[in-house]
Regions:
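Exported/periplasmic ABC-transporter solute-binding proteins
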Residues: 4, 21-66, 70-75, 79-82, ...
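Periplasmic N-terminal soluble interaction domains immediately after the signal peptide in Gram-negative
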Residues: 107-111
Length: 321
């Protein structure tokens, strides 16, 4: 018998949930409604696979709407929102109290809408036999206490550990500092930032002693029609909360293990809004949290924030009956 866990979610398809209020020009010059018009919004680049999917379905459902993502870092995306360059930013944190108070003080309407749960994935080259790692070892690597694979596994001959992030100002870096290191800075000479998540994957694929840190939505990138993103050179590492990592106590960033808490590195994806008129930025953000948007998120491999979700064990026979 082989036991396989599945995540089942009760989410129903729905049509576009928002009704246009017309194109009458307002005093602020805006003509967009919650289902029509054209806007640009900011998004952390690490969420580009799921954002591209959501954009395509939203525009198909609301043919008079055009939403254009600006893929950037978490820091730059939030700053764009604070400077009123965009009214929507998709990222992995809520407003800080200082940011919220600033926007409220300028008669704005800041809102943080939870959209999905994402696992912070660790990837390594398939030549690395250490595909299981403990939370404590990840902390030691990020803090610089460990710089060689032999410090993690005495039998390893891979030499120095090189850690690659997608961007020095990305949400992945923020998560590691705030959630893994407890606010302490990353202090390892062998850590560097690439240009984006795709570059991280390519670097790890050609570097046997590397670890890449990316969002788990890249594990199921449907934009990669050639199916080359997840090639045989890449392994998704399993992470254990215990002192010693084994295949039996370590978990990958998949939906079931995000839901039941076994995978330790989980973050919430938010839509940060500053749209007091509740126009197209508001409409797109709330489409994502609607049943149809949550179904898209579920099918992408992320964990929805809304809907009834259950884990069921299913017995599968190795031999047909």
């Amino acid at each position: 018998m082989k036991r396989i866990s599945y995540v089942l979610v009760g989410l129903a398809l729905s049509a576009c949930l928002f009704v246009s209020c017309g194109e009458q020009k307002r005093k602020d010059g805006r003509t967009d409604t919650n289902s029509s018009g054209a806007i640009s919004f900011a998004s952390d680049e690490s969420f580009s696979p799921i954002v591209d999917e959501l954009k395509a379905v939203f525009e198909m459902s609301c043919p008079n709407a055009k939403v254009t993502p600006i893929y950037t870092s978490e820091v730059d995306g939030v700053n764009m929102l604070l400077k009123n360059k965009v009214m929507l930013t998709i990222t992995a944190r809520k407003f800080t109290q200082k940011e919220y108070d600033y926007l409220k003080g300028t008669d704005q309407l800041p809102e943080a809408v939870p959209l999905a749960y994402d696992g912070m994935a660790l990837i390594c080259n398939n030549k690395n036999l250490d595909s299981c790692i403990t939370v404590n070892d990840v902390k030691r690597i990020l803090s610089g206490k460990v710089t060689k694979w032999s410090d993690v596994n005495k039998g390893s001959k891979l030499g120095d550990i090189w850690v690659c992030f997608d961007n020095k100002k990305s949400s992945a870096v923020s998560f590691c500092v705030d959630s893994i290191l407890g606010g302490k800075t990353i202090d390892n000479p062998n850590i560097f930032a690439a240009k984006n998540s795709k570059d991280v994957i390519e670097y790890v694929a050609r570097t046997p002693n590397a670890i890449g840190i990316i969002g788990s939505n890249w594990l199921n990138d449907k934009r990669d029609s050639t199916n080359t993103t997840w090639n045989k050179s890449i392994t998704v590492m399993s992470v254990s909360k215990l002192d010693k990592a084994t295949p039996m106590n370590s978990w990958k960033p998949y939906q079931a293990w995000l839901l039941n808490g076994r995978y330790p590195f989980v973050r919430t994806i938010y839509a940060l809004l500053n749209d007091p008129k509740r126009g197209l930025p508001w409409g797109f953000a709330h489409f994502i949290e609607s049943p149809r948007g949550q179904l898209i998120i579920f099918k992408s491999g992320l964990l929805p924030t809304r809907g009834e979700i259950a884990i069921r064990d299913v017995d599968v026979n190795n031999k047909p009956r």
